[in-house]
Design a protein with these regions (language model features):
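Sec-dependent N-terminal signal peptides
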Residues: 3-13
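Short, surface-exposed ligand- or partner-binding patches at beta-edge/loop junctions that are enriched
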Residues: 90-91
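Structural scaffold elements adjacent to functional motifs in cytosolic proteins
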Residues: 37-39
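Rhodanese-like catalytic fold shared by cysteine-dependent sulfurtransferases
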Residues: 17-33, 43-86, 95-133
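Generic cytosolic/nucleocytoplasmic N-terminal low-complexity/intrinsically disordered segments
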Residues: 1-2, 63
C-alpha cells in the first residue's frame, strides 16, 4: 500500500510540473499561435546578439546578476493575464531562463512556462535562426 501511495504521489508531482524546455521549431510554432516570447537578458546582450523577432525585452537579471523582480513582474502583468497563459522565456545560454522558469512554475504557480533549449547563443543562433537588432 505504501508503494502505491508513493507512486501516486510521484505521478501527481510529475503531472503538475508544467515548466519545460522547447526547441527552436516549437518556439516558432508557439509564437505563430500567439504565445508571448520574453527575452530576459540585459540591454547590452540585446545589442550584441540581437533578439528573436517578436520577443518582448524584459530584463530580469541586471548586469551584476541581481534580479529586478519588482519591475519585471510589473511588466509581466501587462503581458501575461493569468497563471494558465503560456509564455516562453529565454536568455543567452538557458541558465537564467531555466532558473526563472522553475521559480515561476514551482514557487509562483505559473502553469505553462517554457524556456528555449540552449538559449539564443547556444541554441537559436547556431541553428541559423534569424535575429533582429
Amino acid at each position: 500500500m505504501k508503494k502505491i501511495l508513493l507512486a501516486l504521489a510521484a505521478l501527481t508531482l510529475a503531472a503538475s510540473a508544467q515548466f519545460s524546455t522547447i526547441d527552436n521549431d516549437t518556439l516558432l510554432k508557439m509564437q505563430a499561435q500567439g504565445t508571448p516570447v520574453i527575452d530576459i537578458r540585459t540591454p547590452g546582450e540585446w545589442s550584441t546578439t540581437g533578439i528573436i523577432k517578436g520577443s518582448h525585452k524584459m530584463m530580469f537579471f541586471n548586469e551584476k546578476g541581481q534580479p529586478d523582480m519588482g519591475n519585471w513582474f510589473f511588466e509581466l502583468g501587462h503581458l501575461i493575464k493569468d497563471k494558465d497563459q503560456p509564455f516562453i522565456v529565454y536568455c543567452a545560454h538557458a541558465n537564467r531562463s531555466k532558473a526563472l522558469g522553475q521559480f515561476l512554475d514551482k514557487q509562483l504557480g505559473f502553469k505553462n512556462v517554457y524556456e528555449l533549449k540552449g538559449g539564443i547563443e547556444h541554441g537559436w543562433i547556431p541553428a541559423g535562426k534569424p535575429v533582429v537588432k
